[in-house]
Amino acid sequence: MTKNKKIIFVFIVLIFILLMLFIAKTRRENKIEYPEFETNGQSIYLPTYIPDGYSVKSVRVSDGMTTAEFTDGSEVICFVEIRSTDVSIDIDDEDYETKKAELGSKYGFLSEWDDRKIFTYTDEISTVSISGKLKNKEIEKIVKSIKLYS
């Protein structure tokens, strides 16, 4: 094998290793195993990522609204998707701090009190709310992971 062929071979092996690492990381992040539930014929969106230690507590689908709860045994993360863009968002500044925020490439409102947060945004098809004892980075990961459930 010539020197150039060895360099090309090593380069291809490195690319292959990086690709395998990327695939392994992607599979770890898409780890939610949802129990079987009735979608009532609706197209619904759910996160494919939740923080480590959490599992699905419940999923409910009814008349244009999907609610999923995740728990780690003591804390709960709540995901709500309402299939409407005409939902008004009530901002209560007296009980907790609320500000405009961009998380996971979505613009919305982030409310904080103690160590709990609620991030609510509206996109082209729905209004989504994610709440729980979460850091902003975790909310971003959840937002970016929301996909059509199939």
Spans of features found by a protein language model:
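Coil-to-beta-strand transition motifs
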Residues: 75, 125-127
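Hydrophobic membrane-insertion alpha-helices, especially the h-region
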Residues: 9-23
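Short, flexible turn/loop "capping" segments at secondary-structure junctions
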Residues: 119-124
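Positively charged n-region of N-terminal signal peptides that target proteins for export
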Residues: 1-7
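Short, solvent-exposed recognition patches
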Residues: 25-118
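Surface-exposed amphipathic alpha-helical segments
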Residues: 127-150
